[in-house]
Amino acid sequence: MFRTLVVAAALALAACSGPPAPTFHATDITGAEYGRTLALTDHNGKPRTLDDFRGKVVTVFFGYTQCPDVCPTTLTTMSEVMRRLGPEADRVQVLFVTVDPERDTQALLANYVPAFDPRFLGLRGSLDETAAVAKDFRTFYQKSGDTSGPNYTIDHAAGTYVFDSQGRARLYVKHGETAENIAADIRVLLAGN
């Protein structure tokens, strides 16, 4: 009799606990308050905030157009993610935030970012606006090399932030994650999890 009560109690508790939390390939950052102050201009000259993309899953990557490796690799991976998502990709917005507004003009971003996928948007702001957005995301960037002229490089964090369709930070995707895994994670978010 006691055993029957214990089993019944365990089943009742399991039924009350709700569905299990989704599991992701990327790092789950649900509850983080990133991106609240993102207010930059896109490569078409339109002011943007994350609220502009409510209803879509949004990815945010910080980089620059003269980046020799991480940035083009990440944008290529995100292009493959969009291909894998098929029609669901229309519910995803990829944002590339330049950390080099001195060299990355609106025109340069308009040529560079959509070359990976015409739906992608490049965002830029002043030096101060860029610094404020990076601080809000708790991300790192810094000029390096010969900073006295135009041939400097920029050291920067290489991960991508993913927001759900309600505008909540949900995932941090480390550089090098596969397009297959990123697409799988985005599908979970598109399903409302």
Where do the protein language model's features map onto the residues?
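A short beta-strand-turn-helix
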Residues: 38-58, 82
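Post-signal peptide N-terminal segment of mature Sec-exported envelope proteins
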Residues: 23-47
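Short active-site neighborhood of thiol/selenol oxidoreductases, capturing the structured segment around
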Residues: 50-74, 78
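C-terminal motif of bacterial Sec signal peptides marking the signal peptidase cleavage site
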Residues: 12-15
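Thiol/disulfide oxidoreductase modules built on the thioredoxin-like
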Residues: 129-185
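Bacterial N-terminal signal peptides that target proteins for export
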Residues: 1-6
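Structural microenvironment flanking redox-active thiols in thiol-disulfide oxidoreductases
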Residues: 73-133
